[in-house]
A protein has these predicted regions:
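Alpha-helical scaffold segments that flank or form the walls of functional sites
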Residues: 89-90
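Histidine-centered, transition-metal-coordinating active-site segments
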Residues: 1-86, 96-415
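Aromatic-lined, polymer-binding surfaces characteristic
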Residues: 93
């Protein structure tokens, strides 16, 4: 295979990149992932959480390579030489289509040309303007690229090939859970990666299954995922600053359309270009967003500068109501809260912030994790059954000056 490159990784140690993979990694399309943070605004709560989609993608490639090699040894003939090469590359490229700030900006509120990151990834792989497309064609040929996309999408291939990189027990989740836990310093849960990798088998119908003797390893993995959502991904500062960023960009678009705010070319591409090409999309990173938002802190518009000032200097952060609310309860108290906030001299629209939280728990049956005997793992684990319910609640933020009055009002409605 020629020369190899060794990369030292904080989570996995030495990662080995074969020569063909190195050529993919060295493209501009892939190097862009160095400038997209894995956890968006989590660094406001966890200062060390500035790791990127680049390091995560290399880690997923590493785990996919390990798992494929192990499965080939234990299940001879199940994975062809071509697929053994393509599955790790598919894992490497699984996040190639992420927008700036990852999932946070993956919304039509921000992008005038909206598509999910999986769709943008496919467009980048196929667009002749993108250097990654030409490198893949050179290395894999057109049929190889078609097979690569089929594996990434799970179309026309053995299910387990896709499940290695996208399922409820995939190498993507293995890497980001352990990496995010390590780098945020969140000492909770944890799972035995080595045991989990060894527990994965291939069923007769071509699905990934786990040994009944490894249920405890899967339990630890799923419980860790549950804790990470509670403590990190749904942290109140992460949720609040995410809203600040999205609202700042929405306001910037409004001001631009009214002629009162010039936008940089890349910001126009994101907010106003309804015919955004994959090549132009693949030039968007966190860096230009941060630079523009910091400039807006001095703008004359109080709404735009208010959001930008909070993000750039942490001045005047809104405070969370110390009451557990569901979405329906928030809607019931919204108008009274807006009236109270307005009477206190604040903006009832921009100073009442609702951050809904919703995350599906473990999904059983067709999408679930199956044992070798065909049962869903939930049937053999009361613990997994207990975390299969959907998590849904709301965070409400208001100015500090009126938080206590708002809490009194909400409590009066909930009686």
């Amino acid at each position: 295979m020629g020369d190899k490159r060794y990369i030292r990784d904080a989570l996995h140690g030495d990662l080995i990149l074969p020569d063909d993979v190195r050529k993919i990694v060295d493209t501009r399309s892939f190097q862009r992932l160095r400038y997209i943070q894995q956890l968006a605004t989590c660094h406001y709560a966890f200062p060390s959480a500035t790791h990127t989609r680049f390091s995560h993608s290399l880690g997923v490639f590493h785990l996919a390579t390990r798992l494929v090699e192990d499965l080939r040894e234990r299940f001879p003939g199940k994975i062809s030489d071509e697929d053994a090469r393509l599955v790790p590359i598919a894992a490497l490229l699984h996040d190639i289509g992420h927008p700036p700030f990852s999932h946070m900006f993956e919304t039509p509120e921000v992008f005038a040309t909206f598509a999910g990151h999986e769709e943008w990834g496919k467009r980048i792989l196929l667009d002749e303007e993108c250097d990654l497309s030409s490198v893949l064609k050179e290395l894999l040929g057109e049929s190889g690229v078609e097979r690569l996309i089929a594996i990434m999408e799970g179309n026309g291939v053995a299910p387990f090939l896709h499940e290695i990189i996208s399922s409820q027990l995939d190498v993507d989740r293995f890497d980001y859970l352990l990496r995010d836990q390590l780098i945020t310093g969140t000492d909770v849960g944890g799972f035995d990666l080595e045991r989990l990798l060894r527990a994965i088998n291939i069923s007769e119908d071509g699905r990934l299954v786990v040994s009944i003797y490894s249920i405890s390893a899967v339990e630890a993995y799923l419980v860790t995922r549950w804790h990470m959502y509670q403590l990190v991904y749904f942290h109140k500062l992460n949720m609040l600053t995410s809203v600040y960023y999205v609202r700042a960009l929405v306001r910037a678009r409004e001001l631009h359309e009214s002629g009162s705010l010039p936008l940089s070319l890349k910001m126009r591409d994101m907010l106003s270009n309804r015919d955004l090409t994959p090549y132009r999309y693949s030039q968007l990173t966190d860096s230009f967003v941060i630079a523009d938002v910091f400039q807006w802190a001095d703008h004359d518009d109080p709404v735009l500068s208010g959001y930008a000032r909070r993000l750039s200097s942490r001045d005047g952060f809104h405070k969370r109501l110390r009451i557990e609310l569901n979405h329906q309860q928030v809607e019931e108290v919204r108008e009274p809260l807006m009236e109270l906030i307005e009477q206190a001299g604040f903006d009832p629209v921009h100073d009442l912030i609702h951050a809904p939280l919703r995350k599906e728990g473990y999904l059983p049956y067709q999408e679930g994790i199956h044992l070798e005997d065909g049962r869903d793992i939930m049937e053999a684990s009361p613990l997994i059954e207990s975390i299969s319910v959907e998590f849904s609640r709301s965070m409400v933020f208001v100015p500090l000056e009126v938080r206590e009055q708002c809490e009194e009002l909400v409590n009066s409605f909930l009686k």
